[in-house]
Amino acid sequence: MGVGGIDQAAAMQKAITEISQLVPVPLAIDTSDTKALEAGLKAYPGRALINSVSAEPERLAEFLPLAKKYGAAILCLPLSDKGVPKTASRRIEVMKTIIAHAKKAGLKDHDFLLDALVMTVAADEDACKETLHTLQLYRKHFGYPSTMGLSNISYGLPNRPLINSTFFAMSLASGLDAPIMNPYDQ
Protein backbone atom coordinates (compact mmCIF):
# COMPACT_ATOMS: atom_id res chain seq x y z
CA MET A 1 0.00 0.00 0.00
CA GLY A 2 1.54 3.31 -0.98
CA VAL A 3 -1.11 5.55 -2.47
CA GLY A 4 -0.84 9.24 -1.65
CA GLY A 5 -3.71 11.43 -0.53
CA ILE A 6 -5.63 8.75 1.36
CA ASP A 7 -5.73 7.45 4.92
CA GLN A 8 -3.19 4.63 4.51
CA ALA A 9 -4.14 2.90 7.76
CA ALA A 10 -7.86 2.85 6.94
CA ALA A 11 -7.21 1.66 3.40
CA MET A 12 -4.91 -1.11 4.64
CA GLN A 13 -7.40 -2.26 7.25
CA LYS A 14 -10.16 -2.43 4.64
CA ALA A 15 -7.96 -4.20 2.08
CA ILE A 16 -6.71 -6.80 4.55
CA THR A 17 -10.20 -7.46 5.88
CA GLU A 18 -11.60 -7.97 2.37
CA ILE A 19 -8.69 -9.98 0.94
CA SER A 20 -8.37 -12.28 3.95
CA GLN A 21 -11.98 -13.38 3.41
CA LEU A 22 -11.29 -14.28 -0.22
CA VAL A 23 -8.02 -16.21 -0.12
CA PRO A 24 -6.97 -19.08 2.15
CA VAL A 25 -3.23 -18.33 2.05
CA PRO A 26 -1.08 -16.12 4.28
CA LEU A 27 -0.78 -12.49 3.21
CA ALA A 28 2.37 -10.43 2.80
CA ILE A 29 1.80 -6.87 3.94
CA ASP A 30 3.92 -4.45 1.92
CA THR A 31 4.00 -0.86 3.14
CA SER A 32 6.52 1.63 4.48
CA ASP A 33 3.83 3.36 6.55
CA THR A 34 4.04 2.13 10.16
CA LYS A 35 0.43 3.04 10.98
CA ALA A 36 -0.81 1.24 7.87
CA LEU A 37 1.30 -1.80 8.74
CA GLU A 38 -0.14 -1.98 12.24
CA ALA A 39 -3.68 -1.55 10.91
CA GLY A 40 -3.10 -4.42 8.48
CA LEU A 41 -1.56 -6.70 11.10
CA LYS A 42 -4.37 -5.92 13.54
CA ALA A 43 -7.05 -6.68 10.93
CA TYR A 44 -5.45 -9.88 9.64
CA PRO A 45 -6.89 -13.05 11.21
CA GLY A 46 -3.78 -15.16 10.54
CA ARG A 47 0.00 -14.98 10.66
CA ALA A 48 1.09 -12.31 8.19
CA LEU A 49 4.44 -11.69 6.53
CA ILE A 50 5.84 -8.17 6.77
CA ASN A 51 7.41 -7.25 3.43
CA SER A 52 9.99 -6.01 4.27
CA VAL A 53 12.35 -5.20 7.13
CA SER A 54 15.67 -3.63 6.17
CA ALA A 55 18.64 -2.62 8.33
CA GLU A 56 17.62 1.03 8.21
CA PRO A 57 17.42 2.12 11.87
CA GLU A 58 13.92 3.59 11.56
CA ARG A 59 12.56 0.45 9.91
CA LEU A 60 14.11 -1.80 12.59
CA ALA A 61 12.79 0.36 15.42
CA GLU A 62 9.24 0.58 14.06
CA PHE A 63 8.58 -2.74 12.31
CA LEU A 64 10.23 -5.29 14.61
CA PRO A 65 8.06 -4.49 17.65
CA LEU A 66 4.98 -4.82 15.43
CA ALA A 67 6.16 -8.20 14.13
CA LYS A 68 6.60 -9.40 17.70
CA LYS A 69 3.29 -7.93 18.90
CA TYR A 70 1.22 -9.51 16.11
CA GLY A 71 3.23 -12.72 15.64
CA ALA A 72 4.18 -11.84 12.06
CA ALA A 73 7.04 -13.30 10.08
CA ILE A 74 9.43 -10.86 8.42
CA LEU A 75 10.95 -10.73 4.98
CA CYS A 76 14.48 -9.49 5.69
CA LEU A 77 15.86 -7.24 2.95
CA PRO A 78 19.64 -6.66 2.98
CA LEU A 79 19.40 -2.93 2.53
CA SER A 80 20.85 -0.36 4.92
CA ASP A 81 20.95 3.40 5.25
CA LYS A 82 24.07 3.15 3.05
CA GLY A 83 21.98 1.73 0.21
CA VAL A 84 22.08 -1.56 -1.68
CA PRO A 85 25.13 -3.71 -0.88
CA LYS A 86 26.90 -4.63 -4.12
CA THR A 87 28.56 -7.81 -2.86
CA ALA A 88 27.20 -11.00 -1.34
CA SER A 89 29.58 -10.70 1.62
CA ARG A 90 28.29 -7.21 2.41
CA ARG A 91 24.69 -8.46 2.13
CA ILE A 92 25.53 -11.12 4.73
CA GLU A 93 26.81 -8.44 7.10
CA VAL A 94 23.64 -6.39 6.66
CA MET A 95 21.50 -9.50 7.15
CA LYS A 96 23.36 -10.32 10.37
CA THR A 97 22.42 -6.86 11.64
CA ILE A 98 18.74 -7.35 10.81
CA ILE A 99 18.59 -10.81 12.39
CA ALA A 100 20.42 -9.67 15.54
CA HIS A 101 17.97 -6.79 16.01
CA ALA A 102 15.01 -9.07 15.28
CA LYS A 103 16.12 -11.66 17.82
CA LYS A 104 16.70 -8.91 20.37
CA ALA A 105 13.09 -7.82 19.72
CA GLY A 106 11.92 -11.36 20.49
CA LEU A 107 11.54 -12.90 17.05
CA LYS A 108 12.51 -16.56 16.60
CA ASP A 109 14.21 -18.59 13.87
CA HIS A 110 10.89 -19.55 12.27
CA ASP A 111 10.05 -15.86 11.77
CA PHE A 112 12.65 -15.14 9.07
CA LEU A 113 12.49 -15.20 5.27
CA LEU A 114 15.65 -13.79 3.65
CA ASP A 115 15.49 -11.79 0.42
CA ALA A 116 18.54 -12.09 -1.83
CA LEU A 117 17.87 -8.62 -3.32
CA VAL A 118 18.00 -9.10 -7.09
CA MET A 119 19.31 -6.21 -9.16
CA THR A 120 19.04 -6.00 -12.95
CA VAL A 121 21.96 -7.18 -15.05
CA ALA A 122 21.13 -4.32 -17.43
CA ALA A 123 22.70 -1.94 -14.90
CA ASP A 124 25.27 -4.27 -13.31
CA GLU A 125 26.71 -7.28 -15.11
CA ASP A 126 27.78 -8.82 -11.78
CA ALA A 127 24.23 -8.70 -10.37
CA CYS A 128 23.43 -12.31 -11.26
CA LYS A 129 26.66 -13.68 -9.80
CA GLU A 130 26.28 -11.71 -6.57
CA THR A 131 22.67 -12.79 -6.10
CA LEU A 132 23.52 -16.47 -6.59
CA HIS A 133 26.45 -16.13 -4.20
CA THR A 134 24.14 -14.41 -1.70
CA LEU A 135 21.75 -17.38 -1.81
CA GLN A 136 24.63 -19.79 -1.19
CA LEU A 137 25.91 -17.72 1.74
CA TYR A 138 22.41 -17.43 3.23
CA ARG A 139 22.18 -21.22 3.31
CA LYS A 140 25.69 -21.53 4.80
CA HIS A 141 25.41 -18.80 7.45
CA PHE A 142 21.75 -18.80 8.42
CA GLY A 143 19.77 -21.77 7.12
CA TYR A 144 16.56 -19.72 6.91
CA PRO A 145 14.32 -19.91 3.83
CA SER A 146 15.19 -17.52 1.02
CA THR A 147 13.17 -15.55 -1.48
CA MET A 148 13.66 -12.89 -4.14
CA GLY A 149 11.90 -10.98 -6.89
CA LEU A 150 13.12 -13.19 -9.72
CA SER A 151 12.16 -10.97 -12.67
CA ASN A 152 14.18 -8.01 -11.34
CA ILE A 153 17.21 -9.66 -12.97
CA SER A 154 15.87 -8.97 -16.47
CA TYR A 155 14.39 -5.51 -15.95
CA GLY A 156 15.09 -3.32 -18.98
CA LEU A 157 16.15 -6.21 -21.20
CA PRO A 158 14.53 -7.97 -24.17
CA ASN A 159 13.34 -11.59 -23.96
CA ARG A 160 12.68 -11.39 -20.24
CA PRO A 161 10.95 -14.79 -19.88
CA LEU A 162 14.04 -16.62 -21.18
CA ILE A 163 16.36 -14.69 -18.88
CA ASN A 164 14.01 -15.22 -15.94
CA SER A 165 13.65 -18.98 -16.48
CA THR A 166 17.41 -19.42 -16.81
CA PHE A 167 18.01 -17.37 -13.68
CA PHE A 168 15.29 -19.34 -11.89
CA ALA A 169 17.09 -22.65 -12.57
CA MET A 170 20.41 -21.18 -11.44
CA SER A 171 18.78 -19.76 -8.30
CA LEU A 172 17.20 -23.07 -7.35
CA ALA A 173 20.62 -24.72 -7.69
CA SER A 174 22.04 -22.02 -5.40
CA GLY A 175 19.47 -22.59 -2.66
CA LEU A 176 16.43 -20.44 -3.47
CA ASP A 177 13.35 -21.63 -1.57
CA ALA A 178 10.45 -19.32 -2.44
CA PRO A 179 10.71 -17.27 -5.65
CA ILE A 180 8.53 -14.26 -6.27
CA MET A 181 7.86 -14.72 -9.96
CA ASN A 182 5.39 -14.68 -12.81
CA PRO A 183 3.89 -18.18 -12.94
CA TYR A 184 2.99 -17.65 -16.60
CA ASP A 185 6.58 -17.21 -17.79
CA GLN A 186 7.58 -20.17 -19.98
Annotate each language-model stretch with its function.
Residues 1, 15, 19-20, 45, ...:
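Gly-rich Lys/Arg/Thr-decorated short loops/hinges at beta-loop-alpha junctions or inter-strand turns
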Residues 1-25, 116-128:
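Glycine-rich, proline-tolerant flexible connector loops at the mouths of alpha/beta enzymes
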Residues 22-28, 45-50, 141-155:
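Short beta-strand/loop segments at the ligand-binding rim of alpha/beta enzyme cores
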Residues 46-76:
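Active-site-proximal beta-alpha core segment in soluble small-molecule metabolic enzymes
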Residues 61, 69-186:
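Catalytic alpha/beta core domains of metabolic enzymes, predominantly
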